């Protein structure tokens, strides 16, 4: 063997020497996730992203990230079977500003409502809000016994089911078409749509456990930062300054000059 051809010796290291282990978290940053102003609790938690390196920007990795949060955590409430999806639309400093992206009921709640001896009625409709968001709403309701009913079962006839389904679609369309996304979310939080449907269908067949069980976001308008800031209560539409930020006029004598400071 020729001299100087032993590659292992020239490199000066053992074969299979261990690489230096780098902690992956040392290259990452924590960002705060902020919910829109419709909810009582704005700070949802934190999310992790790799720091900006070259052309790979951290904020691009955060945009489009979806968070699923229980309504109980958003409203500091006991009722925990409603889940809201929030999507990151912009990053300001260390804050991820989110917007509504969908709603769902928990699996255990849906399973607890389905029982024997009653009719389950479902409906869905695609509706556009006044500010251009296309939503698909799903509704569910169950028949219940009439007052003083002795019979064990409470099944609705096919014609009644069709009437109730038609009424569900009408109410869902009306509630969404006439409002913008912010007002629609404000109706989904207490589920006033489900209560309206229950009230309207009493004349056809008594219902209970009526809920807007799911909301899907199908299409969004072009992203506008101003609208997102309004949702987060930071970009006031009026343009007026806050009470404590307004300036006051100061009276000065003619020919007034400020004193010369010794040090700056």
From Swiss-Prot:
Superkingdom of origin organism: Eukaryota
Subcellular location(s) of the protein: Cytoplasm; Nucleus; Nucleus, Nucleolus
Keywords: Cytoplasm, Nucleus, Ribonucleoprotein, Ribosomal protein
Chief place of localization: cytoplasm
SMART domains: Ribosomal_S3Ae (SM01397)
Compositional bias per record (Basic and acidic residues), positions renumbered to this chain: 242-255
Molecular function per GO: structural constituent of ribosome
Region (Disordered): 233-264
GO cellular component, one term: cytosol
Statement: the UniProt record of this protein carries the keyword Transport: no
Any Pfam family hit: Ribosomal_S3Ae
UniProt KW Cytoplasm keyword: yes
Record-linked InterPro entries: Ribosomal_eS1, Ribosomal_eS1_CS, Ribosomal_eS1_euk
Gene Ontology BP, a term: ribosomal small subunit biogenesis
Record text on subunit structure and interactions: Component of the small ribosomal subunit. Mature ribosomes consist of a small (40S) and a large (60S) subunit. The 40S subunit contains about 33 different proteins and 1 molecule of RNA (18S). The 60S subunit contains about 49 different proteins and 3 molecules of RNA (28S, 5.8S and 5S). Part of the small subunit (SSU) processome, composed of more than 70 proteins and the RNA chaperone small nucleolar RNA (snoRNA) U3.
Family note: Belongs to the eukaryotic ribosomal protein eS1 family.
Free-text function comment from the UniProt entry: Component of the small ribosomal subunit. The ribosome is a large ribonucleoprotein complex responsible for the synthesis of proteins in the cell. Part of the small subunit (SSU) processome, first precursor of the small eukaryotic ribosomal subunit. During the assembly of the SSU processome in the nucleolus, many ribosome biogenesis factors, an RNA chaperone and ribosomal proteins associate with the nascent pre-rRNA and work in concert to generate RNA folding, modifications, rearrangements and cleavage as well as targeted degradation of pre-ribosomal RNA by the RNA exosome.
Name recorded for this polypeptide: Small ribosomal subunit protein eS1B
């Amino acid at each position: 063997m020729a001299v100087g051809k032993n590659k292992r010796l020239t490199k000066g290291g053992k074969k299979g020497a261990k690489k230096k282990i780098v902690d992956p978290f040392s290259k990452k940053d924590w960002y705060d996730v902020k919910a829109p102003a419709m909810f009582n609790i704005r700070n949802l938690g934190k999310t992790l992203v790799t720091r900006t390196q070259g052309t790979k920007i951290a904020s691009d990795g955060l945009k489009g990230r979806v968070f699923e949060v229980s309504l109980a955590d958003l409203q500091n409430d006991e009722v925990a079977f409603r889940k809201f999806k929030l999507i990151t639309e912009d990053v300001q400093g260390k804050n991820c500003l989110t917007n509504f992206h969908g709603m769902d009921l928990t699996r255990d709640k849906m399973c607890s409502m389905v029982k024997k001896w009653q009719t389950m009625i479902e409906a869905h409709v695609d509706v556009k809000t006044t500010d251009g968001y296309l939503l698909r709403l799903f509704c569910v309701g169950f028949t219940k016994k009439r007052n003083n009913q002795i019979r064990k079962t409470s099944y609705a006839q096919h014609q009644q089911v069709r009437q109730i389904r038609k009424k569900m679609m009408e109410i869902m369309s009306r509630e969404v078409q006439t409002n913008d996304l912010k007002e629609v979310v404000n109706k989904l939080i207490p589920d006033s749509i489900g209560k309206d449907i229950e009230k309207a269908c009493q004349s056809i067949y008594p219902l209970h456990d009526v809920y807007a069980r799911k909301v899907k976001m199908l299409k969004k308008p072009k992203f506008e930062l101003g609208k997102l800031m309004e949702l987060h209560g930071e970009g006031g539409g009026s343009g007026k300054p806050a009470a404590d930020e307004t300036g006051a006029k100061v009276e000065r004598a003619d020919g007034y000059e400020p004193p010369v400071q010794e040090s700056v």
